[in-house]
């Protein structure tokens, strides 16, 4: 089973799990996808939406606890990525500098100086980008507090926003009938972003 199929059936397969374990599972996935480079393939959007559906369907799950943990996991994950880029990535590039690397760093610094705040916020909604943008921001030495504020806003808009969309899809009658269409939107968006990124790289 593919990761996208697993995410799409998250509410069905993991609903029997005890609430505490479900919290830990969702928070762990969010942190890994946003903070650990090797976990860029995790389908965070679909997981968040499905977690909201599960929270609405279970009486023993607290949506406030769920979204608070998701916010913290997303926020801390991006902070880890930023610090990794700044403390490890930048020194490594400076140690192994070349004209090509210097040009890349200069371009990254110029981009983050002009568009960094919005890039960090918007990257949350694009698979892969939300994993790699924070460490690149660190490498480019984006001002810490500027990154901090963008990270917080992005964590709320993405982590809390998508989870609550799933939650209300299952609790509001007018939206419930469209819950699968909304879930499909997030899954298709994830697939399209991967396809576009790969096509641009070739």
Outline where the language-model segments fall.
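Transmembrane alpha-helix interface/packing and boundary motifs in multi-pass membrane proteins
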Residues: 27-48, 123
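Short hydrophobic/aromatic, small-residue-rich stretches within specific transmembrane helices
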Residues: 67, 151-152
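Hydrophobic alpha-helical transmembrane bundles that constitute the permease/transmembrane domains
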Residues: 128-132, 152, 156-159
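Transmembrane alpha-helical segments of integral membrane proteins
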Residues: 157-168
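Membrane-helix interface "capping/anchor" motifs
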Residues: 35-44, 142-145, 149, 201
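Membrane-interfacial helix-loop-helix
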Residues: 1-28, 53-146, 171-186, 193-202
